[in-house]
């Protein structure tokens, strides 16, 4: 535990922020023992706080970041660097992008520095079997070692799963579950835990809304389910909630409503993977629970294959006129 005792959080944050204004892509190489310390200390804080967070507005809510570190810095420039604003992130900090390490290290550092004002939920990519494949493992191995990746896994296994803002806005990474009858079921999930292949915890991190589904449907991802508008309406009514806020899918404008504005999808990585022209968005919730959106436009850049149509990923939501 010596790593925790001598952790200089202010110095770590300062070095991570020094690349502001640099050409995107410049790395920040923290010492391995500093990163280990971030994992150990934040893990302690995650376990000391509930698995179902109860938060108060005002706060800003962000969706997937996926290792797009310079876009994370843009989000903070737009919304205010902590502690200027309170934040809730909905998961998927690592994989796909080039700088998962900087991204997760800054987020964990802010969690340690401002434990009551800065909150991180678990996404489906904060799971060893997923981030072993989609980039984070390789980044850890290339820049440090596999042992450090395992230390992150121990930290991710303790992240909270869901949050409720002022008893009215239910937040999670993926979506609803056919197994979810009572909030007490979420509170009873014991940590540390891996993400199972099915069941409540899996669904909260993996499920997706689908306007063409009545009730529950099969998910094209091969994991969890899809759910229709009626499922959303019933859930909100039963639990006296106003809104579900989730991430997990690329949306063209950075945010997209579903089920008569009873659910919103947030995605905060603009130009996702360099392949999409999507914007990124952050949702600001004020003291009256009015929600507004701050948009990060996709960076203007010439694409090498500008004429070639891009294959959309599974789960891409396209804007369609409501019938």
UniProtKB/Swiss-Prot annotation:
Record-linked SUPFAM superfamilies: Metallo-dependent phosphatases
Matching SMART domains: PP2Ac (SM00156)
Coiled coil regions, renumbered to chain: none
Binding site for Mn(2+) 1: 64, 66, 92
Tissue: Isoform 2 is expressed only in testis, in the late spermatocytes and early spematids (at protein level).
A GO CC term assigned to this protein in UniProt: midbody
Reactions mediated catalytically: O-phospho-L-seryl-[protein] + H2O = L-seryl-[protein] + phosphate; O-phospho-L-threonyl-[protein] + H2O = L-threonyl-[protein] + phosphate
Self-association state and partner proteins as the record states: PP1 comprises a catalytic subunit, PPP1CA, PPP1CB or PPP1CC, which is folded into its native form by inhibitor 2 and glycogen synthetase kinase 3, and then complexed to one or several targeting or regulatory subunits. PPP1R12A, PPP1R12B and PPP1R12C mediate binding to myosin. PPP1R3A (in skeletal muscle), PPP1R3B (in sliver), PPP1R3C, PPP1R3D and PPP1R3F (in brain) mediate binding to glycogen. PPP1R15A and PPP1R15B mediate binding to EIF2S1. Part of a complex containing PPP1R15B, PP1 and NCK1/2. Interacts with PPP1R3B, PPP1R7 and CDCA2. Isoform 2 interacts with SPZ1.
Function: Protein phosphatase that associates with over 200 regulatory proteins to form highly specific holoenzymes which dephosphorylate hundreds of biological targets. Protein phosphatase 1 (PP1) is essential for cell division, and participates in the regulation of glycogen metabolism, muscle contractility and protein synthesis. Dephosphorylates RPS6KB1. Involved in regulation of ionic conductances and long-term synaptic plasticity. May play an important role in dephosphorylating substrates such as the postsynaptic density-associated Ca(2+)/calmodulin dependent protein kinase II.
Protein name, per record: Serine/threonine-protein phosphatase PP1-gamma catalytic subunit
The organism of origin for this protein: Rattus norvegicus
